[in-house]
Swiss-Prot record:
Originating organism: Euglena gracilis
Protein name according to UniProt: Cytochrome b6/f complex 12.6 kDa peptide
Signal peptide: none
Keyword Transport attributed: yes
Cystine crosslinks: none
Function in brief: May be a component of the cytochrome b6/f complex which is part of the photosynthetic respiratory chain.
Any Gene Ontology CC annotation: chloroplast
Length: 30
């Protein structure tokens, strides 16, 4: 959920190097 940067701050991972595409906890498609 959210941007890759925001999810990264929540322990997630930015996917594809694209801002706005991230994963919260590496499990929730953002």
């Amino acid at each position: 959920s959210g941007s890759g940067v925001r999810s990264a701050k929540k322990g997630g991972k930015a996917q594809g190097g694209q801002a706005g595409v991230g994963y919260k906890g590496s499990t929730e498609p953002g």
